[in-house]
């Protein structure tokens, strides 16, 4: 039994560290830029590929959102979205370090609102996760894509989906 628990712990540790390799973080950041519709030059892409930030917060956020969707628990989804805001706060820091300035302030603002629940943005997302505002973009589909891509180690695709969510929120805030 101890061996089984030890093996499980090692697997979990290995699985978490996989998501945090520079290549995977870079893929996520490049995908995020695509989702928000930021054009990256080759220097910016190379810089992002070398970023060594950890993105453990995304793992936690996606687990909570996924579990909340499956169990229809608004509180879990709400907590997951708040955690997602905390995770997204690292994105502008990494972009700034790579000389990317487009939408950085907007991303910071949305991340801050998500992480603190300011202006009811988390409630807006919860309400609109079923179907989002006048553009009829389905945020729940973007969340589910981000989660599925993350689980399958498609960090670029997960980044595109999260970037698309943030892009929709930036557009909705204008």
Swiss-Prot record:
Keywords: Disulfide bond, Glycoprotein, Secreted, Signal. Probably contains disulfide bonds. It is found in: Secreted; Extracellular vesicle. Its main location: secreted. GO terms for cellular component: extracellular region; lamellar body; post-lysosomal vacuole. It comes from the Eukaryota. The keyword Glycoprotein applies. Residues 1-19 form the signal peptide. Glycans are attached at residue 156. Belongs to the Sct family. PANTHER family: PROTEIN GP17, SECRETED PROTEIN A. This is Secreted protein A. The lineage of its organism: Eukaryota, Amoebozoa, Evosea, Eumycetozoa, Dictyostelia.
